[in-house]
Amino acid sequence: MKLEVGHIFINDIQFASESKIENGVLYVDEEAVKAIVLEDEKIKSVKFDIAKPGESVRITPVKDVIEPRVKVEGRGGVFPGVIAKVDTVGSGKTYALKGMAVVTAGKIVGFQEGIIDMSGPGAEYTPFSKLNNLVVVCEPVEGIKQHEYEKAVRLAGFRVAVYLGELARELTPDETKVYETYGIMEGKEKFPNLPRVAYVQMLQSQGLLHDTYVYGVDAKRTLSTIMNPTEVMDGAIVSGNCVSACDKNPTYVHENNPVVHDLFEEHGKTINFVCQILTNENVYLADKMRSSDWTAKMCRLLDLDAVIVSQEGFGNPDTDLIMNCKKIEAEGVKTVIITDEYAGRDGKSQSLADADPAADAVVTGGNANQVIVLPKMDKVIGTEDFVTTIAGGNEHSHREDGTIEDADYVVD
């Protein structure tokens, strides 16, 4: 499967009377995008704002971050099963608006949305501080249930992203990246001397606003499955998560999965990047055993030499991570795991809730319990009313001088 991704660089965002992309500037008709969001009767009102790198701006509570894309050639459309009709994506041509994102924010959905600071120490902990962000601040109708509000805000972000992506359909990309993988036997014949490597991506699926969607299907309703890595670049996986900010993969991260991109960089050079295996993180032990069994079985059937396993979330999913690692290693497949740690403020506590000697090759994202002090910002998009209750905060987080002291997992 071959996908060409054309990059349209966005250096600035401005509100205007007409939506268009011109000379690296994204002009947004505020009334047009407002009408798109308000098509959903569950959203009472919506406001839009722009946040740029280096500004004294804080966005909170953050629900999702999305990179606008448009399918210009090939099967299906972006966000299949969610916005576009269900069809296999990952081939043809797709254009992406690079250097910007749609950020959904507003009244808190769960208790684990996060913070994006566009400058200061907090900006160093989030990749989204380096983007020009169009922020969608939604206000729900009275009496709406949490899961209904989450869905409404989630879909609002996707609709706005699709609208903006369409502006690039007739443009010429500033650069184009080509990604290609091969069938099982074809790849083996093409790269006979390279190790066969796959990426096992664990998707948050604990429920109660801890959800991820694959082609529109809630991941907790799935079994481990194989995907072509290019499918994620067309939005085949999207976030519905209100899990702790540093522990969730916003949709932007799925679209630009760094593990996928790093493996493609080595594809055909040092490794044969065979495929991507998706597995979930359900809460019941039987589900964990079933999914990890299937994942290990697939690794063996694909005759893999090695896999990289990444985890989403922490605590309960640590068990899924170790089960996957242990069972895949037992099949004779070398395993590297990617996780973060919750080692206490002093870094001396046990990092994960589970462990096994098989997990002897670990890449860590750092200690999420580390304390960070965020300075007062000149402007807040959304509201700071919830910084004491989001995951990582406490009743003393919001200081009288306007600074915020939290564990660093409040940062999105």
Each model region followed by its residue ranges:
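Gly/Ser/Thr-rich loops at beta-strand to alpha-helix junctions
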Residues: 204-205, 310-319, 341-344
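A general structural motif
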Residues: 256, 282-296
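Membrane-embedded hairpin module used as a gating/binding unit in multi-pass transport
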Residues: 188-280
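Extended, charge-rich low-complexity interaction segments
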Residues: 362-394
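Charge-patterned, long linear interaction tracts outside catalytic cores
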Residues: 392-412
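Long, compositionally biased, glycine/small-hydrophobic-enriched stretches that function as flexible linkers
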Residues: 1-223, 407-412
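A short helix->loop->beta-strand "cap" motif at the edges of active sites that frequently abuts
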Residues: 330-336
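Glycine-rich, charge-decorated loop segments at or immediately adjacent to ligand/cofactor-binding or catalytic sites
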Residues: 342-360
